């Protein structure tokens, strides 16, 4: 069987922004690239300026790898590179080519995604991914349709693939008062953690409203403008309870 090389005929990718030394998107200190374009419209989205699939700055996989390599001395044993967005699955071929270069250089690769679809390019990308940060947004299909514009079933199918491939996964969720701070959501996430051995970490992230200025600048309403931010202690306690189900 011929070895698939994602760097062959790889397209350029659209990059929204780069954080050279990030500390919240994967383990250790990381070079974090936020890719442009997203098919979802999450009510709590803090980067609406990444939605446009035609925006951003074009990079070849090699050019992005060169930028990340310059930060290597800061990564240590725990750090590496992360692709976020936007939704990096929209540019899976480019992302796979970039991760292939990183892997060949011994850099740890991390993918921050909603898991909104799983095609062959996405599977190729995952085969080059050392850790996935999977954002599970709501506990039922109705809320996914209403507040995300996507399908919970797509994310669950993605998680099933991660589990089958044994890809270390961090389960992430944003705690939004009145929407995801519920007993239903907590029980749902706890069940996912207990049923999927690939999940070895849980992160409950507090809903924030710092993005409001971005919506104002774009001339569009922020759907959760009147929603309060959560109590941080309660968020940490919820994370602790769900984490008890890690296998």
Feature map (PLM): residue ranges:
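Auxiliary Fe-S-binding modules of radical SAM enzymes
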Residues: 1-22, 177-247
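Short glycine-enriched, charge-decorated loop/helix-capping segments at active-site entrances
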Residues: 49-53, 145-151, 218-227
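Solvent-exposed alpha-helices and their adjacent loops that cap or buttress functional pockets
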Residues: 8, 24-26, 75, 125
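Short, conserved loop/turn and helix-capping segments at secondary-structure boundaries
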Residues: 58, 149-152, 229-232
């Amino acid at each position: 069987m011929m070895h698939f090389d994602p760097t062959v005929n790889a397209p350029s990718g659209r990059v929204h922004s780069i954080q050279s030394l990030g500390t919240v998107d994967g383990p250790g200190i990381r070079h974090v690239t936020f890719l442009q374009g997203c098919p979802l419209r999450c009510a709590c989205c803090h980067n609406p300026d990444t939605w446009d699939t035609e925006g951003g700055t074009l990079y070849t996989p090699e050019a992005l790898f060169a930028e990340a390599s310059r930060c290597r001395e800061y990564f240590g044993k725990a750090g590496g590179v992360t692709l976020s967005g936007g939704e990096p699955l929209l540019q899976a071929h480019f992302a796979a080519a970039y991760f292939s270069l990183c892997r060949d250089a011994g850099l740890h690769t991390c993918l921050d995604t909603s898991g909104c679809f799983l095609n062959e390019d996405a599977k190729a990308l995952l085969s080059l991914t050392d850790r996935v940060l999977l954002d599970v947004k709501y506990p039922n299909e109705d809320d996914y349709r209403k507040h995300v514009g996507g399908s919970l079933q797509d994310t669950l199918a993605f998680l099933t693939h991660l589990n089958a491939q044994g890809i270390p996964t961090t389960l992430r969720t944003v705690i939004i008062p009145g929407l995801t701070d519920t007993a239903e959501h907590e029980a749902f996430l706890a069940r996912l953690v207990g049923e999927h051995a690939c999940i070895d970490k849980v992160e409950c992230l507090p809903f924030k409203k710092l993005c409001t200025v971005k919506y104002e600048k774009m001339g569009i309403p922020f759907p959760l403008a009147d929603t309060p931010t959560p109590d941080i202690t309660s968020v940490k306690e919820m994370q602790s309870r769900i984490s008890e189900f890690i296998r």
